[in-house]
Regions:
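Conserved phosphotransfer microenvironments
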Residues: 48-65
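Two-component/phosphorelay signaling modules centered on CheY-like receiver
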Residues: 11-30
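CheY-like receiver
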Residues: 118-143
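Acidic, metal-coordinating helix/loop segments flanking the phosphotransfer/catalytic sites
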Residues: 33-49
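Alpha4 helix (beta4-alpha4-beta5 surface) of REC/receiver domains from two-component response regulators
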Residues: 62, 83-98
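C-terminal output helix
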Residues: 86, 104-113
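Conserved phosphotransfer cores of two-component systems
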Residues: 43-45, 67-73, 94
Length: 143
């Protein structure tokens, strides 16, 4: 079961997203209303997924960069009611893995997370296959 942390200043939004994730089979190990408390949850639980409100990302200086540095395999999902092309591009450049749109639609949220997880697994498998192929090619010519 994949572990998740939710960081959002809105208790209502945290509660709704918590319900969607739990119903979808995720283990929500913590919720926070601030980036600082959210980072403490990451230290404690080392989650696979972090859902962080756009406002928290804008207020929490370099929080995405810190998560990317300390937990490089953690998937980061930006949560917001509105996304424009510039926001999406900037978020991807920071290391955001995907986007969850408010108001939450359970199927959409779960499909978004599932698709990002599947894409990540495919990338990891391709990288491992490439490494295995490179290693095999290097071993083939030596006696």
């Amino acid at each position: 079961m994949l572990k998740a942390v939710i960081i959002d200043s809105s208790a209502v939004a945290r509660g709704l997203l918590n319900t969607v994730l739990l119903d979808g089979g995720y283990d929500v190990v913590g919720q926070s209303h601030t980036c600082a408390a959210g980072l403490a949850l990451l230290i404690k639980f080392n989650p696979h997924i972090v859902c962080i409100a756009r406002e928290q990302m804008e207020n929490g200086e370099d929080v995405v960069r810190e998560i990317r540095t300390k937990w490089p395999k953690t998937l980061i999902f930006m949560v917001s009611s509105e996304f424009d092309a510039a926001t999406i591009q900037a978020a991807h450049a920071m290391g955001v893995s995907g986007f969850i749109v408010k108001p939450f639609k359970a199927d959409t949220v779960l499909n978004t997370i599932r698709n990002v997880v599947i894409a990540m697994v495919k990338r990891q498998r391709a990288a491992m296959a490439k490494e295995s192929g490179d290693a095999a090619a290097g071993d083939g010519g030596e006696a």
